[in-house]
A protein has these predicted regions:
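A general structural signal for well-ordered secondary-structure junctions
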Residues: 22, 34-35, 77-81, 104, ...
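Active-site-proximal, substrate-binding regions of enzyme catalytic domains
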Residues: 43-98
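Conserved beta-strand termini and adjacent loop/short-helix elements that scaffold enzyme active sites
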Residues: 39, 85-87, 145
């Protein structure tokens, strides 16, 4: 797998459960033109995002089942690739990003973690709908859409 894209979990949630950001998420994934990397951390965060949508009554159980089926279909089709993320090796990268950029960009810890994970996994693109996270990804040398 040569070209790969790492998507922030909020973008993934909008990709699989329709909301106001779904068109932008679809456009970002289409523009990336590469398989999306998916770590166990992102899977956990996505599961939680789905459950929060249920709690907030923004989605139904049927919506969640459909979203999960769509994700499984994308994994089977090779559009999403499950990858291992060695967290212990991501934290030093995240700490470096924090020291260099947080005071300038104003990024939150989990946003930094995702950028660090993308760097560790050698993703060729970083997909996010968050402007601060996008600025951090660019400052870290990642291509964004």
């Amino acid at each position: 797998m040569s070209a790969t894209a790492y998507a922030d979990t909020s973008l993934l949630a909008s990709l699989y459960l329709a909301d106001a950001n779904t068109p932008a998420a679809l456009a970002a994934v289409s523009a990336a033109g590469a398989p999306l990397l998916l770590t166990s951390w992102q899977q956990f965060e996505l599961e939680n995002a789905f459950q929060l949508r249920l709690f907030r009554r923004e989605s139904t159980r049927a919506d969640l089942a459909s979203a999960e089926a769509h994700l499984i279909q994308d994994i089977s089709a090779g559009m999403v690739a499950i990858v291992a993320l060695p967290v212990a090796s991501v934290l030093p990268i995240a700490r470096q990003l924090t020291a260099r950029h947080t005071a300038l960009v104003g990024t939150r810890a989990f946003d930094i973690f995702h950028v660090a994970a993308a760097l560790q996994l050698k993703a060729t693109r970083f997909l996010t709908l968050d402007t601060r996270q996008r600025a951090l990804a660019r400052a870290a040398g990642l291509r964004t859409t």
